Amino acid sequence: MRILFMGTPDIAAECLKALYAAGHDICAVYTRRDKPVGRKQVLTAPPVKEVALAHGTPVFQPRTLRDGSEDENIRALAPELIVVVAYGCILPKSVLELPKYGCINLHV
């Protein structure tokens, strides 16, 4: 199944790994932007981004999805399903209606 994954923290990264292990086609990953961490404020990628890049999956990090700026990009990815795990952004109705089989959202 062609899946668009959206998530950010460690728990989401573990879910993404499970989807890869199950043989699903992850067409792209959406995650929050890299942010400064620690005393030296080192710019650090979210765990989901690291997993996706290790698998050669395209990663997108928009500030928001609510303004519709990503609708065309998501439509072009043609996901059959969107899986959301602790993403941190609200998905607008325009995105929720795109995939053939809808969206699955896991709150943690």
PLM regions and their residue ranges:
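One-carbon transfer enzymes
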Residues: 1-108
